[in-house]
Amino acid sequence: MTDIKQVMMSEDRSRRAEIFMKNDVWHVNMIIGGQLVECRPMISNGTVHSLSYAEDAAENWCMGIID
């Protein structure tokens, strides 16, 4: 079981993001209407990103910037 570190929601509560760490990498669960759309690890081009990066990604998901 993975412990969720932080949860964010869109204003209309249709989009939700859950931030958690697994194997020393932050991940963001991207959810619409209770359905998991994607679990995105916060790694790009071999770079493991910070919690702050994961929070930005979660916020972008909730705002609809990431689709």
Predicted regions and their residues:
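Mixed-charge, Lys/Arg-enriched low-complexity segments
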Residues: M1-M9, I32-D67
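Short N-terminal "domain-start" leader segments
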Residues: M1-I31
